[in-house]
A protein has these predicted regions:
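N-terminal alpha-helical interaction blocks
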Residues: 1-55
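Cys/His-clustered metal-coordination modules, chiefly Zn-binding fingers
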Residues: 51-127
Length: 127
């Protein structure tokens, strides 16, 4: 058995983190999971071209899926911090950096690390 390369480890971790956030929002349907897989394929090529970017993969996959969902369904993930008013999506910060977090720019707060949205939402789903 061959050891798993750092690239494959990072891609698997990014996939798992984004899928965890999708599951937390109860939006991990088959077509959405396909969006994750498409992003992973594209980011594999990207990081093969720029190996130093391997630590940025999780945030980039999260952003890719967020963009794909916006085009297909609407904003995701919705902010669990701000109560009433106009629902708005969280953003990933840093846009290109390690340790990505979901942030609410409206409230000016970090909401959760990518992969941990379930804890930020208190484990409950919103309707």
């Amino acid at each position: 058995m061959h050891p798993i390369s750092p690239l494959e480890q990072a891609l698997h971790a990014a996939r798992a983190l984004v899928l965890a956030d999708l599951a937390a929002g109860e939006v991990a349907a088959a077509d959405v999971v396909s969006m994750v897989e498409e992003s992973v394929v594209q980011r594999r090529w990207w990081v093969e071209q720029w190996p130093e970017g391997v630590e940025y993969i999780a945030g980039l996959v999260a952003q890719d899926v967020q963009d794909a969902l916006l085009e297909a369904y609407g904003r995701w993930p919705l902010c669990p911090v701000c109560g009433g008013g106009d629902p708005h999506a969280l953003d990933v910060e840093p846009e290109l950096g390690p340790d990505p977090h979901w942030v609410c720019h409206k409230a000016g707060v970090k909401v959760a690390a990518v992969g941990t949205l379930a804890s930020a939402a208190g484990g409950s789903s919103s309707s």
